[in-house]
């Protein structure tokens, strides 16, 4: 002891001798440290300014409901948090007395508030002298009072409280901020709309530093009723979750999809071997772990009780404690059960499919041919099946699990033979014949697609009675054997989009179950649900529980939940929802987790930036705007629409017409290539139609038209129009100027654009009716009678029968090379067409032959119910006589005779230049 005292005295004298030099060196080092910290904070501030600018653009100029936008916002917010934490760490590395005023100004409190989306009016009310450091030193009640005084809402207070707690955690650890560790649950809360408010924020919902048991804290907490925090943790943003030290300090790693691996299950059951040495951390003194919670092991039934290992007792000092884990908050006294109706991992059952336009759920690229899983409805390329996520049966009835013989179920998928337990969320009723097997007795040698090893089962609580007969009760009995103490209410099923809303129960009358949520890019589950334990009673304050807002919503993407919908065809499942433009839902109480509309995804595929289009000379002018020749990966036709693109109703109508164009693929219909959908440049881009319009072709005296050529042109038009009608598209503007003819090929253009004619800005007159003669003769009588000044064209009663009437006029033009009513005033034409008398006079005054007149009279029928369909018109065209030329008279027609009759039937003899002359009956 004396020797140690002498050595200490000698060291003290040595320090006094060199004290002056050390003090000077320390002063110089402190100044250099402050300078370096200030420089680092300045560089970080530049990055913060850039990130805030990008974040402001995403929040104000982009659709926040888009999944890609939300992902970018979360990424920028995480970057800003990391930069601000680094700024504060740089400032804290300098002693308080050596910091300059400029260094003390970092990090800026306004940047912190904008990161967590605090309203500008709240930021303006915050005092100038309030800093982030001062806010960190306040307790929770004082922070709440300060923010409330500035006008912050409960949601904003909850977000800032949660963020400050995470920042205190990072500062207390003294380590570098991890981007995905502390803020993932906050992002998930804010994304689902159920962020932690100051009223519900408790110690159980806050992240605890590594090494502390959240189970113990939840059990020892005396603030309010015991509860747990339920939040969705996206797999892409959260670390590998595991149980914390509450489970005898045994870590159970899980996959990103949230299910236990066979290796994790083995490590959970088997006592640990020699623990590994922990690196780069100080060893903790040996201590005995807390006894395992009996309530927790009810999550995994029929597992043997873990016994304490003697070798483990002696090597506790080498145990690894600092493992990032997902903390499970479990309420004491709450029975937990294994639920296998959701998250059941089975092998994909792919079948080949083809779509007009579809997005691969794996590579996010468009595809036409691919495969679709009959279990989880995953759609992807055949080559992408290797990278496809694990298959999940989601609310599928048992009848839909039967194997089909289309494609083997193991396409590019190795069969996992190991039986894996999974956690479920929702009760699913089974019939009496469907007896679910016990989870720990799964047959690993059975077929992966067999229903005996992959059928969802019904949950039931474990009996806690000491009766020996109850010990043999299977973990998943039928619903009839369910304990009467736990009453699971039926879920509120929303027919649209298969959403389940669960009422939020009171903490004093129910128990809560923690759910593991997995997030896939396109085929995702956002699971956040509660279960009831009793019928909804009245709470302590007199309010009924069913009057509380539904705050937790489950959304199953492309999953069918009800039995009546099990027989729905695949075509209905893949239909486009044009009425959902843009993505809209019926208003529900409480926040709802949205997914991007399927229509919005399709429109993104066909959107062409206007800057990529090379605009050429104008080639036409219509009532909707000018048509230009242009180039976009080749020669195209660009139709610029003169409409107010900033009007949301007009823009929605335009996108609906784009959807009509998108679903057309026919050789006689113009090829749609895309559309410019960003105002003010709205345009439809189609393939460039070579050749001439049918209007100019039939009026050219140099072209010869015989019966074979007119029949061929008419058949091509009927094929294209029949295809459009089969797709549910009404042309509304069929005329010879909208039909192109080139080398025997007919192409129909400008179909469906009448739907937006009422919103065109150019040439609009409210008190005038602008009509052109080349349009009147194509209109059906029911449309002409409805035309009045001030009534838009898109409000007229267009129908498929009206298209047939317009085809009759085109058929007349092919025969007579002119319009049926010419050289007449517009008023006279309106009366003759509207009354039907004008077309009758045309049919009686012109001799076009019996077969031609029959087609005209059928198409021009006054009653629209009497007009034939295009399929019947095709049969009528087939009955037209065939032209057999004589070698000696190549320029004239023949005289055909009826074989079955001795009477000579008059036929077409020859065409004049614009006039069709009838044949001589005497010949």
Curated annotation (Swiss-Prot):
It catalyses: L-seryl-[protein] + ATP = O-phospho-L-seryl-[protein] + ADP + H(+); L-threonyl-[protein] + ATP = O-phospho-L-threonyl-[protein] + ADP + H(+). Its main location: cytoplasm. GO terms for cellular component: cytoplasm; cytosol; endoplasmic reticulum; endoplasmic reticulum membrane; intracellular membrane-bounded organelle; membrane; protein-containing complex; ruffle membrane. The protein kinase domain is predicted to be catalytically inactive. The domain is sufficient for KSR1 and KSR1-mediated MAP2K1 and MAP2K2 membrane localization. The domain is required but not sufficient for MAP kinase-mediated inhibition of ELK1 phosphorylation. The N-terminal region mediates interaction with BRAF. Also mediates membrane localization. A zinc finger (Phorbol-ester/DAG-type) spans 347-391. The modification Phosphothreonine is found at residues 270, 274, 425. It is found in: Cytoplasm; Membrane; Cell membrane; Cell projection, Ruffle membrane. This is Kinase suppressor of Ras 1. Changing residue 639 to M: No effect on MAP2K1 mediated-BRAF-KSR1 dimerization and BRAF activation. Changing residue 665 to H: Loss of MAP2K1 mediated-BRAF-KSR1 dimerization. The lineage of its organism: Eukaryota, Metazoa, Chordata, Craniata, Vertebrata. Its EC number is 2.7.11.1. CDD domains: C1_KSR1, STKc_KSR1. One of its GO terms (molecular function) is protein kinase activity. The keyword Endoplasmic reticulum applies. Keywords: ATP-binding, Cell membrane, Cell projection, Cytoplasm, Endoplasmic reticulum, Kinase, Membrane, Metal-binding, Nucleotide-binding, Phosphoprotein, Serine/threonine-protein kinase, Transferase, Zinc, Zinc-finger. It comes from Homo sapiens. The modification Phosphoserine is found at residues 311, 334, 351, 406, 569, 888.
């Amino acid at each position: 002891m004396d020797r140690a005292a002498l050595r200490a005295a000698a060291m003290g004298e040595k320090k006094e001798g060199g004290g002056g030099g050390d003090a000077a060196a320390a002063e110089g080092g402190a100044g250099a440290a402050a300078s370096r910290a200030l420089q680092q904070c300045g560089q970080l501030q530049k990055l913060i300014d850039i990130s805030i600018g990008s974040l402001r653009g995403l929040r104000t100029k982009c659709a926040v409901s888009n999944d890609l936008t939300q992902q970018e916002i979360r990424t920028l917010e995480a970057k800003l948090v990391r930069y601000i934490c680094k700024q504060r760490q740089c400032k804290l590395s300098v002693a308080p007395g050596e910091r300059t005023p400029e260094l003390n100004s970092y990090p800026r409190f306004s940047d912190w508030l904008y990161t967590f989306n605090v309203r500008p009016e709240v930021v303006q009310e915050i005092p100038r002298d309030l800093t982030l450091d001062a806010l960190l030193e306040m307790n929770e009640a004082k922070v709440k009072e300060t923010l409330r005084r500035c006008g912050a809402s409960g949601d904003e207070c909850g977000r800032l409280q949660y963020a400050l707690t995470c920042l205190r955690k990072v500062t207390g650890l003294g380590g570098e901020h991890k981007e995905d560790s502390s803020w993932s649950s906050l992002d998930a809360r804010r994304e689902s709309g159920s962020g932690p408010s100051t009223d519900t924020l408790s110690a159980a919902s806050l992240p605890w530093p590594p090494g502390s048991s959240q189970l113990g804290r939840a059990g020892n907490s005396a603030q309010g009723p015991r509860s747990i925090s339920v939040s969705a943790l996206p797999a892409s943003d959260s670390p590998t979750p595991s149980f914390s030290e509450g489970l005898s300090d045994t870590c159970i790693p899980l996959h990103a999809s949230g299910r236990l691996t066979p290796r994790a299950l083995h490590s959970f059951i088997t006592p640990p071997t020699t623990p590994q040495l922990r690196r780069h951390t100080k060893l903790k003194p040996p201590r005995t772990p807390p006894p395992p919670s009996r309530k927790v092991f009810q999550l995994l039934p029929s597992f043997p009780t873990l016994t304490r290992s003697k070798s483990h007792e002696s090597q506790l000092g080498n145990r690894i404690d600092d493992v990032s884990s997902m903390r499970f908050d479990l309420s004491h006294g709450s029975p937990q059960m294994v639920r296998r109706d959701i998250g059941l991992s089975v092998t994909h059952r792919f079948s080949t499919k083809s779509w007009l336009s579809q997005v691969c759920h794996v590579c996010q690229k468009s595809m036409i041919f691919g495969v679709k899983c009959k279990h989880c409805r995953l759609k992807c390329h055949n080559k992408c099946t290797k990278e496809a996520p694990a298959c999940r049966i989601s609310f599928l009835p048992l009848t839909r699990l039967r194997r089909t013989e289309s494609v083997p179920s193991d396409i590019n998928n190795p069969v996992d033979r190991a039986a894996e337990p999974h956690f479920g969320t929702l009760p699913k009723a089974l019939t009496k014949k469907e007896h679910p097997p016990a989870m720990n007795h799964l047959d690993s040698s059975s077929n992966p697609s067999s229903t005996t090893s992959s059928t969802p089962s019904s949950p039931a609580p474990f009996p806690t009675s000491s009766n020996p007969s109850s010990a043999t009760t299977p973990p998943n009995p039928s619903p009839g054997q369910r304990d009467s103490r736990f009453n699971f209410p039926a879920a509120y099923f929303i027919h649209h989009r298969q959403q389940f809303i669960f009422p939020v129960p009171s903490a004093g009358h129910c128990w809560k179950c923690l759910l593991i949520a997995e997030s896939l890019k396109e085929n995702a589950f956002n699971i956040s649900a509660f279960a009831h334990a009793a019928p909804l009673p009245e709470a302590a304050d007199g309010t009924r529980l069913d009057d509380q807002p539904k705050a937790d919503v489950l959304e199953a993407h492309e999953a069918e939940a009800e039995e009546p919908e099990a027989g729905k065809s695949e075509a209905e499942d893949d239909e486009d929802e044009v009425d959902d433009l843009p993505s809209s839902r019926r208003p529900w109480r409480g926040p709802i987790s949205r997914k991007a509309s399927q229509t919005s995804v399709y429109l993104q595929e066909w959107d062409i930036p206007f800057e990529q289009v090379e605009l050429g000379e104008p080639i036409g002018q219509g009532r909707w705007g000018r048509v230009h020749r242009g180039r976009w990966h080749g020669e195209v036709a660009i139709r610029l629409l003169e409409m107010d693109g900033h009007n949301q109703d007009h823009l929605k109508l335009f996108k609906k017409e784009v959807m009509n164009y998108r679903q057309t693929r026919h050789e006689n219909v113009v090829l749609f290539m895309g559309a410019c959908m960003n105002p003010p440049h709205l345009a439809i881009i189609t393939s460039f139609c070579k050749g001439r319009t049918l209007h100019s072709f039939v009026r050219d005296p140099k072209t010869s038209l015989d019966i074979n050529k007119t029949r061929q042109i008419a058949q091509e038009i009927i094929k294209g129009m029949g295809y459009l009608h089969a797709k549910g598209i009404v042309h509304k503007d069929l005329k010879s100027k909208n039909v192109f003819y080139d080398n025997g090929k007919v192409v129909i253009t400008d179909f469906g654009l009448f739907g937006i004619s009422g919103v065109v800005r150019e040439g609009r007159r409210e008190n005038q009716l602008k009509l052109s003669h080349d349009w009147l003769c194509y209109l059906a009588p029911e449309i002409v009678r409805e035309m009045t000044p001030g009534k838009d064209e898109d409000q007229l009663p267009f129908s498929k029968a009206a298209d047939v009437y317009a085809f009759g006029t085109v058929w007349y033009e092919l025969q007579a090379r002119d319009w049926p009513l010419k050289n007449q005033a517009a008023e006279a034409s309106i009366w003759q067409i509207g009354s039907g008398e004008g077309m009758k006079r045309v049919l009686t005054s012109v001799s076009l032959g019996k077969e031609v007149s029959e087609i005209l009279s059928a198409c021009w029928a006054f009653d629209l119910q009497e007009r034939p369909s295009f399929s019947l018109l095709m049969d009528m065209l087939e009955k037209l006589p065939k032209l057999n030329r004589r070698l000696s008279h190549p320029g004239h027609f023949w005289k055909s005779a009826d074989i079955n009759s001795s009477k000579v039937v008059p036929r077409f003899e020859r065409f004049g230049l614009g006039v069709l002359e009838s044949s001589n009956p005497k010949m």
